[in-house]
């Protein structure tokens, strides 16, 4: 089971998923889209679900509001079992769960105001209630001045803000985001992510978003779940997963293996090898700078620095160094112990003959 947060009471998580499976029939075969998913999501947090295309992200998020019915398993929203609800109760539950989509799903023949008002009209609210609520959410997303315009007159980012406003009209407790920024340019993406953070902080709404972009996870998520072939393969607080990704798929998504080094790197020692190439990872609280001098001077030999990257995530400073040491017989365990006060991981990633 995956749970998050050391100070959260998980006796009643906002969303509780147990042994969730989803199987599709495709061309005479069974495709296992979700495999034994166990997940607790606390109230008021932003959870990011990341994975490659076809990993099972969309299948998972669509089960959370009943758009997909799982083949087996349990989904509870505040202890209410979603999988056994009848149609009428499922409709009521969906009003507590907003959803925004990659391609906006706006009605082109209706104005911005009418698009946002539509869910309330369908639910039978009176005109005064509809007007007050639509005006309120359009102001929240910064589009009150666009109320009478049509989708064709809006930018992609503005269309997505309309989608967010529409998702908020029923005062939802949960907001599901299905690749909400993948169709947007970087500037619009930044606006949408800032808006989602604002909604989470001001309204306390639990947000679950799926994406294939690690930058989205980095920007706004509290926790991250990595899905591969329908299974949760890695999870944790964002800073922790980013600083020390364990699974190959997570490392690939973070592009840690895509090194741009000015020489050929070999996995094994060969006749041309003169240096061991090492990756060093270190982390600290954001207000404490790493002591790079102590790290590099601990080797008692010349150290060649080929790559350095420092990032700040969730008030944690995360660093990666790629260095070269003119030794081929390094004892990594001894080095790890020697450097332990300054780093949390060191590994040999290959051997080379650098030209410096």
From Swiss-Prot:
The keyword ATP-binding applies. Keywords: Amino-acid transport, ATP-binding, Cell inner membrane, Cell membrane, Membrane, Nucleotide-binding, Translocase, Transport. GO terms for molecular function: ABC-type D-methionine transporter activity; ATP binding; ATP hydrolysis activity. Signal peptide: none annotated. Gene3D superfamilies: 3.30.70.260, P-loop containing nucleotide triphosphate hydrolases. Its EC number is 7.4.2.11. ATP binds at residues 51-58. It is found in: Cell inner membrane. The keyword ATP-binding applies. The complex is composed of two ATP-binding proteins (MetN), two transmembrane proteins (MetI) and a solute-binding protein (MetQ). This is Methionine import ATP-binding protein MetN 1. It comes from Acinetobacter baylyi (strain ATCC 33305 / BD413 / ADP1). The gene is metN1.
């Amino acid at each position: 089971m995956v749970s998050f947060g050391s100070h959260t009471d998980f006796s009643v998580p906002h969303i509780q998923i147990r042994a969730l499976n989803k199987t599709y029939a495709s061309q005479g075969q069974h495709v296992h889209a979700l495999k034994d998913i166990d997940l607790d999501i606390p109230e008021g947090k932003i959870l990011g679900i990341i994975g490659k295309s076809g990993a099972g992200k969309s299948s998972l998020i669509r089960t959370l509001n009943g758009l997909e019915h799982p083949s087996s398993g349990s989904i509870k929203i505040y202890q209410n079992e979603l999988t056994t609800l009848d149609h009428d109760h499922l409709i009521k539950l969906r009003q507590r769960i907003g959803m925004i989509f990659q391609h906006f799903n706006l009605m082109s023949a209706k104005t911005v105001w009418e698009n946002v008002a539509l869910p309330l009209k369908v639910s039978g609210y009176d005109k005064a209630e509809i007007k007050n609520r639509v005006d309120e959410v359009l102001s929240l997303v910064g589009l009150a001045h666009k109320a009478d315009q049509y989708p064709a007159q809006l930018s992609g980012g503005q269309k997505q803000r309309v989608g967010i406003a529409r998702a908020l009209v029923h005062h939802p407790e949960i907001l599901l985001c299905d690749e909400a920024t993948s169709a947007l340019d970087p500037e619009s993406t930044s606006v949408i992510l800032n808006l989602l953070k604002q909604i989470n902080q001001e309204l306390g709404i639990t947000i679950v978003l799926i994406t294939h972009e690690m930058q989205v996870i980095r920007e706004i998520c509290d926790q991250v779940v990595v899905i591969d072939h329908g299974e949760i393969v890695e999870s944790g607080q964002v800073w922790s997963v980013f600083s020390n990704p364990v699974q190959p798929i997570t490392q690939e998504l973070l592009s840690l293996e895509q090194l741009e080094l000015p020489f050929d790197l070999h996995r094994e020692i060969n006749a041309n090898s003169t240096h061991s190439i090492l990756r060093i990872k270190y982390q600290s609280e954001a207000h404490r700078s790493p002591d790079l001098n102590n790290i590099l001077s601990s080797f008692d030999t010349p150290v060649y620095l080929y790559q350095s990257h420092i990032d700040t995530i969730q008030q944690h400073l995360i660093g990666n160094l790629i260095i070269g040491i003119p030794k081929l017989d390094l004892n990594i365990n001894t080095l790890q112990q020697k450097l332990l006060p300054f780093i949390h991981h060191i590994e040999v990633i290959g051997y080379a003959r650098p030209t410096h």
